[in-house]
Design a protein with these regions (language model features):
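Metallo-beta-lactamase
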Residues: 1-76
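Accessory terminal helices/loops
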Residues: 43-45, 56-139
């Protein structure tokens, strides 16, 4: 992130892994680090956020929504791991339906995109961290 402290507070973020509209793609992401980055962004006094992809944001509602999605994903994956579920069973158990509606609405294309670009890779990335307590740099 780059801050410009003079005049009006801005934050310029990098690529779509931080913010992307309508769905935040999670391929190759470290969800715990992503959550921490979003928390830092939320804590700034920025009134304008310029992501590398997606529209300019003039409030932090989308950031909060993405963080909530990631928090829910990691929490559900952690619970599944604690219950001894495999990755395949965890994929079936994680329920992000309320987020699907917020990000994809009724669009079949956006719903498929949400499943394939957000849910599936996010669960895959969160599982080894929940199971082993460390990040994995492979997809």
């Amino acid at each position: 992130m780059q801050s410009f402290p003079h005049r009006r507070p801005y934050e310029i973020t990098s690529d779509k892994r931080l913010l992307s509209c309508p769905s935040p793609y999670s391929f190759g992401s470290f969800l715990s680090e992503w959550i921490e980055t979003l928390k830092k962004l939320e804590a700034t006094d920025a009134t304008t956020i310029v992501p590398g992809h997606g529209p300019v944001e003039h409030d932090k509602e989308y950031i909060k929504l993405v963080r909530s999605l990631l928090d829910s994903t990691t929490s559900q994956v952690q619970q599944a791991v604690q219950a001894g579920l495999s990755l395949d069973d965890t994929r079936k158990k994680v329920d992000l339906e309320s987020f699907r509606k917020q990000f994809a609405g009724d669009s079949p294309t956006l719903n498929a995109d949400f499943q394939e670009g957000v849910v599936d890779p996010a669960v895959k990335r969160a599982y080894p961290e929940a199971k082993e307590g460390k990040l994995h740099d492979e997809d």
